[in-house]
Amino acid sequence: MSLKIVVLAKQVPDTRNVGKDAMTAEGTVNRAALPAIFNPEDLNALEQALRLKEQNPGSTVGILTMGPPRAGEIIRQGLYRGADTGWLLTDRLFAGADTLATSYALATGIQKIGDVDIVIGGRQAIDGDTAQVGPQVAQKLGLNQVTYAEEILKVEDGKATIRRLIDGGVETVEAPLPWVITVNGSAAPCRPCNVKLVMKYKYATCPMERKSDEPWANLYEERPYLTLNQWSVADVDGDPAQCGLSGSPTKVKAVKNIVFQAKESKTLTSSDEDIDGLMKELLNESIIG
């Protein structure tokens, strides 16, 4: 059966490079001051979506993301790997959203897309580590949900079969579509970008990303697929009071970059004297014994 699949993806700050300018005065993350990457677990989710597309002829995969205009890069990265389209939720009213406001915005976007069979995203984003958005989207849409997915085994007869990680093992679950699925980072890694698709979608942008003096501006009329969908709060019939800072009961107080300092090291030999000295030291410090 053909499937309409939406991948929830996020452009996140590279948490390996957090500096002193990481926070704004309002207590939100200053994303403009940090290098941006495709959230790693969302790439795992994208791979599962692309495999479903291959297994079910006629299926489509779209990338849904929320952020400033530069977040369109996430959609391009998805197109380079085999996605068919994308939607960027971008509006100042979306800015500063916590998980509650984010899930509300994404849910309104999914409703506007319409007739979605599977919504799939990473278990959590590396800039928040809450793992809340996927389940909240499912709750807002009233859909079945499965978390900690390792693999979508098959979709047939209107049902999806999914293998998920649990404490001490794995379990296999099955339920009728539509589903909201969150995928672990331990799932299959995403395929690399396809050179032909990079060439095809190199200039794919949303309208807010474009500059009037671009030499390839005429391409957007000749090749409509290069225009990414760009939606505001009004476009998705959203309630401004439930979006961005206005709809966020929580906000980040601070972000700190903690660097673990190396401690003094000792080099020991296999001599009885060194081993005896080490054992006495460990006993004295109550590390063993």
Region locations from a protein language model:
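N-terminal glycine-rich FAD/FM-binding segment characteristic of electron-transfer flavoproteins
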Residues: 1-289
